[in-house]
């Protein structure tokens, strides 16, 4: 079984998906981590962190590196790089590289392969998870929140290294890019459960989702 969670950046997808995976006993996957790892690969390939590389060059670089899945984490050449991919430098470039159709195809293929060759249940979160990657998921969720709430969440995650105004501006740019992508854009899919998390705590959101999930299972019996 797959529970797919979609929504904009900093809407709570990762935190909620992780918590739900514990409560429901599902494995957790974040597609965003894959795109961030690929962005890290790109950044390691040139001197200036403000430069961008072409799609063909990035596709070749990805093929030269080993991205593997271990339990609930993606590894780059056997290394857990989570502490290297959650920063403003990655934030600035990840939407650009994730707009490359070839890169999206690689990520989507890897996600589907992980699920295909496993008997486990999964909670998978990320943009376009409910529309492109796993539109047939048994339960689809779209999490949302106001731009100010999302900026505040990101501010707390980053220990105040950027101002709220900078984070809000970055998120607005990210939203605009994500909603206007040629392929895999951010949008509501048919049959999705929409939930605004702006003024709800983690436990409250998880309880609402679990209640809705259990009700859906009862109705489908």
UniProtKB/Swiss-Prot annotation:
ATP binds at residues 7-15. Keywords: ATP-binding, Cytoplasm, Kinase, Nucleotide-binding, Transferase. Its EC number is 2.7.4.25. The keyword Kinase applies. It comes from the Bacteria. It holds the Pfam family Cytidylate_kin. InterPro entries: Cytidylate_kin (IPR003136), Cytidylate_kinase_dom (IPR011994), P-loop_NTPase (IPR027417). GO terms for biological process: pyrimidine nucleotide metabolic process. GO terms for molecular function: ATP binding; CMP kinase activity; dCMP kinase activity. One of its GO terms (cellular component) is cytoplasm. The keyword Amino-acid biosynthesis does not apply. Signal peptide: none annotated. It catalyses: CMP + ATP = CDP + ADP; dCMP + ATP = dCDP + ADP. Belongs to the cytidylate kinase family. Type 1 subfamily. This is Cytidylate kinase 1. The lineage of its organism: Bacteria, Pseudomonadati, Spirochaetota, Spirochaetia, Spirochaetales. The gene is cmk1.
